[in-house]
């Protein structure tokens, strides 16, 4: 069995985490298994389900700049102790560099960098994240993204055109199928009657691009 290590912040109900769980639930777990390397020291919403599916959750030292040497050592120790892990699938915006570099130093043969965004958050950590972003292509063996624009932003156009892979976010369509009784209940609850309703399911964050919807 091949174990794939997913590097994330923690397994709460965010977009990346939900996408991973949608894939995980339908994975052929006789051949592949997901394990999770989390950076935040708090329980995640999906932790119990992960363990029920046979996955393991490992704690990293965190992705603060001062933790970088400890992170590299921790990653090398983890992969030495668990040779069944053959693949790293890294998320975490630009800070995924920590996991990618640690896996590279440990000699892990497959290191997937996954771009989920077309920009970096403009916060106090922006200079550090921008610096880390420049080194991701050299630390990864494979370039994945949710779309072409995100791939070009993280890896550059030439690298993306040569090696990029678009991984569509997995969605369990049965959960969102049309159900007349649910429609009637919600319309009655919110007093919508037969009005035209345009729904948008997303956090109120810049990367969700609500301005395009409003325009």
Residue map of PLM features:
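A short helix/loop element that forms part of the nucleotide-sugar donor recognition site in Leloir-type
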Residues: 75-76, 177-191
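An amphipathic, basic-hydrophobic alpha-helix
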Residues: 49-56, 61-87, 97-101, 105, ...
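A short, active-site helix/loop in glycosyltransferases that binds the activated sugar's phosphate group
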Residues: 139-177
């Amino acid at each position: 069995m091949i174990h794939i290590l997913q590097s994330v912040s923690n397994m709460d109900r965010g977009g990346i985490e939900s996408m991973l769980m949608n894939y995980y639930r339908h994975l052929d777990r006789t051949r592949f298994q997901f394990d999770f390397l989390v950076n935040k020291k708090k329980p995640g919403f999906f932790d119990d389900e992960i363990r029920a599916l046979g996955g393991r959750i490992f704690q990293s030292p965190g992705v603060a700049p001062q933790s970088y040497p400890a992170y590299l050592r921790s990653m090398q120790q983890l992969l030495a102790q668990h040779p069944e892990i053959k693949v790293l699938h890294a998320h975490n915006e630009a800070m995924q560099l920590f996991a990618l570099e640690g896996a590279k130093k440990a000699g892990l043969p497959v290191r997937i960098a996954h771009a989920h965004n077309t920009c970096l958050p403009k916060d106090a950590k922006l200079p550090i994240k921008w610096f880390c972003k420049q080194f991701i292509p050299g630390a990864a063996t494979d370039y994945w993204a949710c779309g072409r624009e995100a791939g070009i932003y993280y890896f550059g156009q030439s690298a993306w055109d040569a090696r990029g892979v678009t991984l569509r976010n997995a969605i369990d369509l049965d959960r969102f199928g049309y159900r007349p009784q649910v429609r009637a209940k919600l319309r009655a609850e919110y007093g919508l009657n037969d009005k035209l309703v345009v729904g948008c399911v997303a956090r109120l964050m810049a990367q969700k691009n609500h301005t395009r919807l409003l325009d």
